[in-house]
């Protein structure tokens, strides 16, 4: 039940994660261990089922790099503003591009309320001074 990351693709090896069932679990679990022991490269392709490919040589490394680039490209497209992963505050609230806008509106409202309360306090203070002067 291990998890490996190679070249931007993730291979999950386990009884419930291989193909459509448990049939290839033992073979899939043994393939990465045998492949790494021999100094070969393990590449995983994400699709309907997880495929583990043990490759060796320059051509296989080039193929592995190609798989990594496809995974990175898909990740870059998936992380846009509209999915909530691009332009965001990182608050974990799922606001996406709306987060900075909402924060700006709340900030502007707070500044407006503060300035308004200062004006009201100044007016009350002036009234109190006038009242004190009138009573004395």
Curated annotation (Swiss-Prot):
Compartmental location: Magnetosome membrane
Residue intervals on the Cytoplasmic side: 1-85
Span of the signal peptide: none
Chain ranges passing through the membrane: 86-106
Highest rank taxon of the organism: Bacteria
Job of this protein: Promotes the formation of magnetite in Fe(2+)-rich conditions, when magnetite is not readily formed. Binds both Fe(2+) and Fe(3+). May help control the production of crystals with a specific morphology. May function with MamX, MamY amd MamZ in biomineralization. The 4 genes of this operon collectively influence magnetosome size and number.
Self-association and partners: Full length protein oligomerizes and interacts with MamA.
Name of the protein in its database record: Magnetite biomineralization protein Mms6
Lineage per the UniProt record: Bacteria, Pseudomonadati, Pseudomonadota, Alphaproteobacteria, Rhodospirillales
């Amino acid at each position: 039940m291990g998890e490996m990351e190679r070249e931007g693709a993730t291979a999950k090896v386990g009884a419930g994660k291989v193909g459509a069932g448990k049939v290839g679990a033992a073979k899939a679990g043994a393939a990465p261990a045998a492949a790494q022991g021999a100094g070969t490269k393990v590449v995983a392709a994400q699709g309907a089922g997880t495929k583990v490919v043990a490759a060796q040589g320059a051509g296989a490394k080039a193929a592995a790099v190609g798989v990594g680039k496809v995974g990175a490209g898909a990740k870059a497209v998936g992380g846009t503003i509209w999915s909530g992963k691009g332009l965001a505050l990182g608050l974990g609230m799922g606001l996406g591009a709306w987060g900075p806008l909402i924060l700006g509106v709340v900030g502007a409202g707070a500044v407006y309320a503060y300035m308004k309360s200062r004006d009201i306090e100044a007016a009350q203070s002036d009234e109190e001074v006038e009242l004190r002067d009138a009573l004395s």
